[in-house]
Amino acid sequence: MTKLHSVDFFPAQEVSVAIEPRLPQGAFPEHHHDFHEIVIVEHGTGIHVLNGQPYTISGGMVCFIRDSDRHMYEHTDNLNLTNVLYRSPDKFRFLAGLHQLLPQECNGHYPSHWRIDQHTLQQVRQLITRLEQVSAGQDLSTVANREILFMQLLVALRKNSLLEGDENTDARLNHLIAWLEDHFAEAVSWEAIADRFALSLRTLHRQLKQHTGLTPQRYLNRLRLVKARHLLRHSDDSVTHIAFSCGFADSNHFSTLFRREFGWSPREIRQGRDASLQ
């Protein structure tokens, strides 16, 4: 597995924050690094595999990667990211208690993927632009300015993420997407889902397509297929059992959609035929 080193991304040893845009981000094999990373998903879609667990990502998602994590990107479609790299929180000169603004692991669960609305995404872009404009200088005012902007970024992300809740349309759609991640295997009525999240059916279709580039059913199918592929690689369950457990009522239809999505049949994935691409 590749290890990325801070010396290749930070302009100086003393600089605590660096910006690394990926416009676009193609498929990238599993790797880890000796720094932390906040991934801002600008637009497009892809699959982010963090510590072996797949997540479908799209515009407005924020991913928090620790220096102890391993991750990779695959099956990307016009995926544009901005990576905010930062050193260990104890390396900051003026900021104390920084960890309180970051996701915290609790009972073995690490809430690594957040969602923000489009207004917050624009705020975040502006803060990142200002961070990019700060020089690599180490005089007190420059260091303080850099760290203040980074703290403002963390505050904006936390305040406007799903953790804090909101009632606008963007927030309701983000809650819907998070709900689908947890309930992908259930039979879905889009009319009932729209009612559940106080959206009109037309708004649901339009907004989900705008956020993910996919129709609602296509997005749900991709979620199911990604989860199924994970089980094919990491469990001994039969293909038929996996198809049913991921929400497909017909294993033949599942196999057809699977090959169309990934270019391999479920049995080929089970046999590790795609291993060279992982």
From Swiss-Prot:
GO terms for molecular function: DNA-binding transcription factor activity; sequence-specific DNA binding. Its main location: cytoplasm. Residues 191-212, 239-262 bind DNA. It comes from the Bacteria. The record marks D250 as: Interaction with sigma-70. Keywords: Activator, Cytoplasm, DNA-binding, Repeat, Rhamnose metabolism, Transcription, Transcription regulation. InterPro entries: AraC-bd, AraC_XylS_family_regulators, Homeodomain-like_sf, HTH-like, HTH_AraC, RhaR_RhaS-like_N, RmlC-like_jellyroll, Tscrpt_reg_AraC-type_HTH. Residues 174-272 form the HTH araC/xylS-type domain. Signal peptide: none annotated. One of its GO terms (biological process) is positive regulation of DNA-templated transcription. It is found in: Cytoplasm. GO terms for cellular component: cytoplasm. It holds the Pfam family HTH_18. Gene3D superfamilies: Homeodomain-like, Jelly Rolls. HAMAP family: HTH_type_RhaS (MF_01534). Binds DNA as a dimer. Activates expression of the rhaBAD and rhaT operons. This is HTH-type transcriptional activator RhaS. It comes from Escherichia fergusonii (strain ATCC 35469 / DSM 13698 / CCUG 18766 / IAM 14443 / JCM 21226 / LMG 7866 / NBRC 102419 / NCTC 12128 / CDC 0568-73). The lineage of its organism: Bacteria, Pseudomonadati, Pseudomonadota, Gammaproteobacteria, Enterobacterales.
